[in-house]
């Protein structure tokens, strides 16, 4: 599956509303097929439930390959991290070439640094991603840890 667009809203009382626009090569041309969509929904619910039941750290990701198009027209990866609301929350903006598993790698890196996502806007345009996150966490309050987070995120988005 590929995530074309996502919006993530997290409340202070640990509730989340996440919406994803997903495509699947297996469903190409069948998005108006109710049976195919029901199958996709069942599969995704089972995968989410399995992940919730595991209650363990996120597994290592298998790095996806860049497409020929992304290799032919490379994009300079970019990360911007800006404080908002008296440094309580931070806006993280990432621009990079897309590849399978990239969003997962970003999420895993944020988790490893103890960062929680309060709001996210995930956009995929062809081979390019423009993702914006509103994040918070102890690591953001210390410049050295903030720099390490940015370095780790850059390593994720810059690797092919």
Where would I find each of the regions flagged by the language model?
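Non-catalytic interaction/regulatory segments
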Residues: 1-160
């Amino acid at each position: 599956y590929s995530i074309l667009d996502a919006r993530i809203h997290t409340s202070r009382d640990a509730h989340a509303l996440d919406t994803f626009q997903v495509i699947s090569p297996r469903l190409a041309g069948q998005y108006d097929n109710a049976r195919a969509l029901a199958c996709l929904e069942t599969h995704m619910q089972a995968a989410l439930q399995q992940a919730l039941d595991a209650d363990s750290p996120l597994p290592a990701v298998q790095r996806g390959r860049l497409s020929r198009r992304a290799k032919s027209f490379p994009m300079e990866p970019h990360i911007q991290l800006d404080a908002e609301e008296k440094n309580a929350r931070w806006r993280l903006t990432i621009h990079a070439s897309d590849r399978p598993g990239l969003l997962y790698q970003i999420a895993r890196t944020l988790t490893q640094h103890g960062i929680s996502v309060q709001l996210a806007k995930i956009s995929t345009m062809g081979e390019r991603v423009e993702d914006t996150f509103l994040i918070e966490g102890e690591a953001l309050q210390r410049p050295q840890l903030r720099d390490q987070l940015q370095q780790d995120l850059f390593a994720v988005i810059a690797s092919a």
